[in-house]
Each structure stands twice: as C-alpha cells, then as structure tokens.
Amino acid sequence: MASACGAPGPGAGPGAALGSPAPAWYHRDLSRAAAEELLARAGRDGSFLVRDSESVAGAFALCVLYQKHVHTYRILPDGEDFLAVQTSQGVPVRRFQTLGELIGLYAQPNQGLVCALLLPVERERELDPPDERDASDGEDEKPPLPPRSGTSVSAPLGPSSPPAAPEPPTPAVESAPNGLSTVSHEYLKGSYGLDLEAVRGGASNLPHLTRTLAASCRRLHSEVDKVLSGLEILSKVFDQQSSPMVTRLLQQQNPPQTGEQELESLVLKLSVLKDFLSGIQKKALKALQDMSSTAPPAPVQPSTRKAKTIPVQAFEVKLDVTLGDLTKIGKSQKFTLSVDVEGGRLVLLRRQRDSQEDWTTFTHDRIRQLIKSQRVQNKLGVVFEKEKERTQRKDFIFVSARKREAFCQLLQLMKNKHSKQDEPDMISVFIGTWNMGSVPPPRNVTSWFTSKGLGKTLDEVTVTIPHDIYVFGTQENSVGDREWLDLLRGGLKELTDLDYRPIAMQSLWNIKVAVLVKPEHENRISHVSTSSVKTGIANTLGNKGAVGVSFMFNGTSFGFVNCHLTSGNEKTARRNQNYLDILRLLSLGDRQLGAFDISLRFTHLFWFGDLNYRLDMDIQEILNYISRKEFEPLLRVDQLNLEREKHKVFLRFSEEEISFPPTYRYERGSRDTYAWHKQKPTGVRTNVPSWCDRILWKSHPETHIICNSYGCTDDIVTSDHSPVFGTFEVGVTSQFISKKGLSKTADQAYIEFESIEAIVKTASRTKFFIEFYSTCLEEYKKSFENDAQSSDNVNFLKVQWSSRQLPTLKPILDIEYLQDQHLLLTVKSMDGYESYGECVVALKSMIGSTAQQFLTFLSHRGEETGNIRGSMKVRVPTERLGTRERLYEWISIDKDEAGAKSKAPSVSRGSQEPRSGSRKPAPAEASCPLSKLFEEPEKPPPTGRPPAPPRAAPREEPLTPRLKPEGAPEPEGVAAPPPKNSFNNPAYYVLEGVPHQLLPPEPPSPARAPVPPATKNKVAITVPAPQLGRHRPPRVGEGSSSDEESGGTLPPPDFPPPPLPDSAIFLPPSREPLPGPGVRGRSGGEARALPPPKAHPRPPLPPGPLPPGTFLGEAAGGDDRSCSVLQVAKKLSEVDSAPPGPGRCLLLPGPLELQPARALPSDYGRPLSFPPPRIRESVQEDLAEEAPCPQAGRTGGLGEAGMGAWLRAIGLERYEEGLVHNGWDDLEFLSDITEEDLEEAGVQDPAHKRLLLDTLQLSK
C-alpha cells in the first residue's frame, strides 16, 4: 500500500518522525487551479494530491481525478487535532492522527471516495536550484536576516499543520558575539562548585562569580571613561562649570583591586553617565532658550504658512472658426488666455490690428465645459455661459498638445479651489520609485518630486503645483526610516511651503514605502494599514520582497505596493511567482474582503518598484536602438510586456506608454553610459539595459483615473537606476452616510438579480454559490446553490442561477452615494467553500427601473478563471437619485466634431434634455444605426426610467504614440482607434463587437428588418449573419475519436466571449445579414455607433487546427501557456476582418435584445501592454467617411483624408504633417491661411507657398 500511494502505513505518517521529508503527494501553497492542471496532466483515474485548503486555515483539500473530472474533499481537524474527511450528514466519520494514515486507508477500494487513491501526483521541481541567490546579476546582496517567528516556521505533518519539520535550534552559546561564553563556560565548569560549597557553608556572597564578572567587564571601564571625558567637553560648551563627580572619576587612576569593589565602581560610573546625559540635554535647552530670548523675533513657523500661490499663466492660442465665420471676421484671430487660479478668472485677450486690445473676463462659474478634440491633439473647445443661461462655444488651437493639457489642469485646479463642495471630487497623486543602490541620495532630488526629465512629463506651468498625495517607494535604501522621512518632508516643504503629514511608513530590509498627504487632507484619511511580504528563499530569507500601505480617502480606498523582485535575465518565472506570492500574502485593506486578492480589494491600486523584468535581445542591438531613441522594438521584447500578454502577471493592470530610455543599469555618476558588464567570481555577468523600474495601476470599473506623466529623471546619478515618477488624476467619493439615521418612511433602494450565469475554468462538477460584498451592504450576502449547470467541455463548466436562487440586496447607504459603489462577487464551490473566481461590478450603470446587463471576467489568485454575466437592476426612487456632476466630468471628448459646428453645444451630459416620452419609436428604429448603442450617457426611455447619473468624460489617449513624433499623420486607410473611456481601467467596459452567433438565440424573423434612414453624420453598421453549419469550433486533432479528446479544453459553444478587436465589425461582403428584429439600445432608444477598427488590429486566427500546447491539459511546447481562458472562447468566434465591398453596409443582426453589457475592458481580448496610437479622427467621422454606405450622407467638411488628397494632387504631400500639426486640418479652414501661417507649418519654399495660395484662391 505504501508503494502505491507514496505514504507510510498507519502510525508511521510523516508527522511521526520529525526529520522526514514531506510526502510526494503533498503540495504546500498550491492553488486549486494549479492542482486541477497537475491532475489533468496525469490523466489517469485515481490520480490524487493533497494541498492546503484555501477556505479554512489549517485544513487540507484532497483532490482526486476520476473520468476526467476533479473531485475535491475537505480534510478538517477536530477539537482533538484528529483529521477527518468531511462527509455528508449521517455518514460515520473516520478520524486519523496524520495525513499518512488517512491516505493509506483511502488508497483501498470502496472507502467512500469516488475511487481509490492510486497514483500520487508529485510536486514539480523548482525552476531554479535552491542555492542560487537573487542577486545573480551583480546587485548588492544584503546579509539575510534570521527566519521569522516560530509561528511561520514549518511544523511537522499532523492533524492541523503541514507536513514539514523545523531545523533543531542552535545552542545560544555558539552564536554569542563576545568572549563571555568562554568565561561562563569556565565558571560553570570549575568555580561554580566552589561558590556552591561556600553558600552551603553560610556565605552571603559569591566571590568566584564576582571575580568572573569583574574580569568580563574590565574593558567596559576604559570605554565608559572615554565617553565621560568626551561628554564633559561637550557640557562645557553650554555650561562652564564641570561636574565634580565626573572630574573625580576621571582623575581616579588606580581602580580597586578586589572584584567586588571593581564592580561597584563600574556601577557608579554607569549611574553618573546616565545622569550626565540627561543633564547635558537640560543645559543645552536652557542655553538655547536664553539665546533665543535675546535674539530678534523669529519668523512665523513654516507649518503655518500657506502654499505658494500659483502665478497667472498665459497661453497663446488661435481661434478655430468655420469658413462662414471667416468671411465675417476676416483673418484668423489670435488670443491670449490668462488663467488666474487664485482669483478664479479666465481672461480672453484679443489683439486688434490697430494695436488695441479687447478682453473678456469669465469667472470660474461661467466656464461650463471643456471639450477636447480627438482629431487635433492641440485643439480645445470651451463652453462659456452668456446672459440668460445661454452658452457659447469657442474652439482654440494651442501651440502644442502639452500646452492644452496644462491649460486643462489649471482650469480644473481653479474649479476645485473655488468649488462650493465641502469635499473634493478629484485629487492628484504622485508615485515615485527608485532603486537607490545602497548609496545615500544627493541633496537635490527636486527633479524627481516635480516629474522633470525624460518621457511624458508635466508642462513647466504645472510642475510647481503641489500634489495631494505623495507616495515614495525605494529599494536598496540604506537611509534610516526616520531620516528618510525627514528628508522627504523637508524636500516637499522647500518645494511647496507645505508641511506634508506622514500617513504611513513601512520597511522590509531596505525596501521602503512612505505616504505623505497635504495637511488639509489629514482628517480625510482613515483605516490605515501596512504589511510586508518576503519573497526570498522559502519566502523567508534574502533581500527581495514587497511592502504595502492602504487607507481610505473619504469613501475611496487606495492601495500602494512597492516591491523588489528577483533579478537576473533568466529569472522571469521566479519573478512571476514573486508577484503571485505578494498578491496572495500581502495583508492590506478591509479584512472582510479576505476572499479577494488585493487587485480587487481597492478602488485604486498602484503597484510599483524594481520589478527587474529585462529585455530579451542582444546587448548591441539594444544599445543601437537606445542611441536612436527607438523604443518600440525594445518594448516588444520587454519581459513584463510579454508576460502580461500571456496573462501570467498583472492581469488587467494598466501602464502608461513608455517614452523614456531604460532606467537600468547606468554607470554611476553619469546617465550617458550603460554599465552592462559586471565582473563576478564566477565570470563576467551581462546586465542588458532594461526598464526594471515601473509603475502600474488597477482601478474599479467606472472610476476616474488619468495618468498625466510617466518618466524618469536624467540628473540624479548616484545610483545605477534612474528614479521613475508618475502623476495621476484620481476621482474620489465623499464619506458615505449610513441610512440607519433616516426616517422609516424614507424610500429605500434595493438591488435585484434576474439571473446570473458563470463560465468557470474547472474540471470539477460540484455545485456553486455566490457571495456578494460591498461597503453599501451591512454584511455580505450569499445565494443558494445554482439550479442549472452544463458542460460541453471537460475543462469548463457553465453554472446558472435564476432569480429564485439570488438574494435581494438592501443597501444601508444614502441613495445619493450608490452610483459610486461597487459589488464584489465571488463564485464558491459547495464541496470545499473555495473560490473559483472573483469580480467587481459597478452599480452606476445598473441604476434604473429596468434590468441592465453586465458581463465581466473572473479571476482568482491573479489568474483568469472564466467570466460571469447577468441581469440586475438597482431600483432607486427618481426623486432621490443623485445627479450632481463631478468635477472630472467637466472635461469631455468631442466625439462628433464634424457636426459640432452646426449644433448648439451641450453644456454637460447630465443636463441634456430628455427625449419626449410620448413619441413612439418608429419601426425602423428597431434596427437603427449603432451610433447610440454603446455610448456612455443614456437618454431616458419612454418607460419613464430616471436618467442615468452622468459619467466622466472619456480620457484622452497618450499624446504621442511610440516611435511617432508629435504631429505625425496616421497611415492612410487605417482608422484611428476609439478613445479609452475615462473610467480608464481595463477591468470594465461597454461590451462591443461581440459576435452575434454567441449572443442569446432569438427566433428568426420571416422578413429582413428594414434598413433605417441614416441620421446626420451616422452610418448603419451591421454584421453579416453566419450561415448555418459554417461556424464550428476548430478541431484540435483530425483523428480524435471522442468529443472531449478533439475539443481539448475548448469552452462550450455558448461560452460568452470577450469582445473581439474592433476590426471584427468589418466582415466579408459575401454573407447576407440575418433576418431579425434589429438592434435596440439599452432603453429602446437610438442605436449608437460602433467604434472604428483599431489602427493595428491583430490578425484573425487562421482556419484549421489550433496550435498544440494552447489549451489546458495538453502538452505545451515549453511551459508557456499563453492562451488565456477568455482567449480560448475568442478563438472559437474569430471572424475575418476584410473591409466591406463597395456599396455594402455592415448590419448588426437582431439578437441584441439583451441590454448592452457594461463590465468588460475595451481591450478584453488583446494584450494590455501597448497603448493604441494617437486618435486622429472622431468615431462618427471615420465611419461616415470610410464606409461607402448610400445611407451615410456626409454633412461635415473634408477631414485629414481630404487634406492629404488635395496635397497629393498638387505634389506637396510632404507638408501635410506640418499643416495638420498647426491646426490646418480641414480644407474649409484653409481659405484664410497666410504666408506666415504656411511658414509656421514648415512651408519655406517661396514657390511652394505661392502654389498653395494660388490653388486655394482658385478653389474659392
């Protein structure tokens, strides 16, 4: 039996002998998903392993494979520390002293398990030999600290502890640092007996022990004398009178000869030293107070000084006008916009031809909205309030996109400063990370604090504006904690005149994180928590690990993680494991959310540090690319980007585009040379230049966060790493108010679920339930077990809950705050109560009188484990729905610039007039264009649903794409990608591009839905229907005899997939649209335009068998399982992306009766590493100009495509980039261009200038 199961017989389990190794079938810290994967590889019935339980501390989980399904049994300890397999009610319980006994019994047949335990699945071997240290690439190695306390030391295998044995303790005398151990040993060996005899004879002292102590402390006499002598000199600086006792002791040359007298003298000296130290402090204090009383009055304390005032900033702009306006006002006008943040005013100064000036002043409350242009990165629309609540919009062209961003930041700061709200809607956060190389920092680190240097930096007019929160993460920081904190506070005070308050400081070895906030925010911070995790050998030794801080800012939770991961080019897998260990073991945030890892526990989580991911490229190629400032090829081989694409680390995290050179490994004292050679005893070590120092973040869905800068300094050269900075604009919520104090008659909000369906990556066939957590709930709620489940594939399980199984949730918060709340869901099994996946759903889009759809992914322990969708509604009384516009919603993105010239500007989304509820939609509206279907704001439906709360404006894309200078045109024929939602995180987005064949089935209509008439600037978009029998899941092997073998781990056909890349809306023109009732919006209103295709879409999956090693359970080539769970589903539904033929429109078929889902990232099916290129054209214009549909009549002017065609026609296409960059992007505006304007755009040749002007004159 022992040979079969790998365990000793009863009574001889691993816990019976303390030094025995752990049995092969036991896997410490193995996740449930990894256990199922190991068993799937084993592939034989009766394969088993034992792992730690994820739900109960001290318990175990026995996993058994039978008929390709994994069965899990919980092994629980009882009150007497016996172990027993959890059984159904009425089944007798068998108790065991050790796991070995338990496994030995159940290895026999017919013992109550699904099958006997036959084949133990052993642990995988370590990726790296245990003797290899982290600092394999030459980083400074710190001496390892002793292990953690005994609570974390492995215990022997027994009823309640994992099977491992601790090392026997080393006697203390062996580690004693001085010679006292020898003296003690001699006394105990010889003189001890003499003292014992003396005591027995009636002696009252121990002469031999006294002599031993006196001999041991003899050197201390001279040391105390030296200290007393030095302190006496220091004392005379403040007081001329010296201490007579100290003088007498120092003049005493001959110490007593007897041991007892010698000890008495030493004790006297120590007593005098203690009093002398305190006396010196009192003398110094008195002397300094006397000096200050005679000195002139001291200035006001710096802590009471206000922050430096922000000077008035001026911006040179041009007024962007239409051709019709130009005929009235003549030449294009130039303005100076002066922003007075302190005074709350914006002054528009216009210079007239006769040198006169005309200016208009607008107070902060009369600036209603800022509208950023997608097409022109330096163009901004400003909506001003005129008399009688009328508004006027003016469009300005700034010198550069960076100036436009600075102007927007100043106006937001002005709005915030003069807001009537008691609590802020938005704060700014600075994140800094720096590996200091075990060297003290230079005196001046201002460039780090002010985000100056290389990459995406702040404009000079905004760098001095203090941030609300500063977070500094350092590695290899040899400065003491208090000294480091004082250095940071001093630097910030010198820079801002503010005394920043330290909120938290956490250290692990030389890894530190410090958080400082403005004094005005100190009372808004609560629930501060700190934690640390060691990731060295056995997660105990070494100098690598992570520290973290979390807190609440009013009602918004923040988490910050600073880490130092394993170094070495070849240690990618170990770095990945470091990340997963930190994710699982770092204890931060609300303890009630222990079922969720820290990536889901916070509204905003920032993760930064020396991640140590390297570049997989030859050193000379890397240096060549860096010298040419070409970073795109290097980012393609960046290990962190590659691992994120494979969904192995930082799942759904975001990172701003990298536009600065690698920050490691520089020659100390310079930023001109990379020191990529390191001489070591084992040979020469190569450290290729790499972006080791990174800042990433992850935020809850429908929250506001924008990265304003991401770069590194170029003037701090003490370390071989450059400091990295990032600044963020983050939306925050007010402190929530409990509803318990309200009257009982007050209307109550509640959350109802109609149905939920989850696809879970598992080979188990157990039942499941859902737990619901939220700060708006008094306690967590749970559903009943699912009432339906099915599986078309062995490695995926679809589970469903109807409304009868789902609870009704009753929030305890005031209704106004619900739109800022989120629900956290975890899907757990009934057999082991272990989580199979967690997710977050925002309530903002769910508020309304009708049910709304959500769809999002599930993850567990940092790995993607499936997805979940459902129908729910958050019912809120209309009269109590909070609709206050947030400050960050004040800036929006112009989505329809072509039509904006002829329409009155919208002041804000929340203030739009609702559509009349009496008008019945026309039949054609059922299949109208999707121009409104996936847009953020909703108009109230005829059913009387209250208007949805306003959302934040979409955030602008990075200003400069990789390898493309500012102002460079996009490639012709390639549409620009849509803008990212301002809820700028990849954890949530409106569902777009979902293949129709995977949406809920609907009875076919006998007649094709009529094509709607095109509205202004909109185009009908449809997706051809699939021909029956054409779309089959691709087969893994042609010769497979069973469905399960041929399917591998393909998901079931109705697996709800992530949205395809936007290019999937362009399909071959040969297929016919599916007859159906058409497309409907969320509330039966207008449809909305789908976004255009990505500028660089991924190629579709080629037909034929999928590559081997892609799916779970198959032998992969190497250990790279890069295909994520939801990519598996995507591969089943990938479609061709050829553009439509001439004259053909794309129609989306009818089965969109379900409301559009709202909880998936817009880039769900593509890697998150590389931000899309710059947006050059609005969504509707792209579709209107590029889709040759007869319904899509154009009303806007020619865009960039028209400009390019005109320049090519006259042979001057070389000037297109310069003209567009300077705002001349439309032929309608060119009629007013002058020679001066042409020169500014780069046209210097007189002949070319004359040709351009003559051609424009002829075209009038």
UniProtKB/Swiss-Prot annotation:
Where do transmembrane segments lie in this chain?
A: none
Q: Which GO terms describe its cellular component?
A: basal plasma membrane; cytosol; filopodium; lamellipodium; nuclear speck; nucleus; spindle pole
Report motif location: SH3-binding: 946-951
Q: Where is the composition biased (Pro residues)?
A: 159-171, 940-952, 998-1013, 1050-1061, 1090-1108
How is the protein's activity regulated, according to its record? Activated upon translocation to the sites of synthesis of PtdIns(3,4,5)P3 in the membrane. Enzymatic activity is enhanced in the presence of phosphatidylserine.
* Record's keyword annotation contains Transferase: no
Disulfide topology: none
Any single Pfam family the record assigns to this protein: C2_SHIP1-2_2nd
The SH2 domain, residue ranges: 25-121
Task: Give the GO molecular function terms.
Answer: inositol-polyphosphate 5-phosphatase activity; phosphatidylinositol-3,4,5-trisphosphate 5-phosphatase activity; SH3 domain binding
PTM comment: the record says:
Tyrosine phosphorylated by the members of the SRC family after exposure to a diverse array of extracellular stimuli such as insulin, growth factors such as EGF or PDGF, chemokines, integrin ligands and hypertonic and oxidative stress. May be phosphorylated upon IgG receptor FCGR2B-binding. Phosphorylated at Tyr-988 following cell attachment and spreading. Phosphorylated at Tyr-1164 following EGF signaling pathway stimulation.
Give residues where Phosphotyrosine occurs.
Answer: Y888, Y988, Y1164
* CDD domains for the chain: INPP5c_SHIP2-INPPL1, SAM_Ship2, SH2_SHIP
- Record's family? Belongs to the inositol 1,4,5-trisphosphate 5-phosphatase family.
Put simply, this protein is called Phosphatidylinositol 3,4,5-trisphosphate 5-phosphatase 2
Q: What organism is this sequence from?
A: Sus scrofa
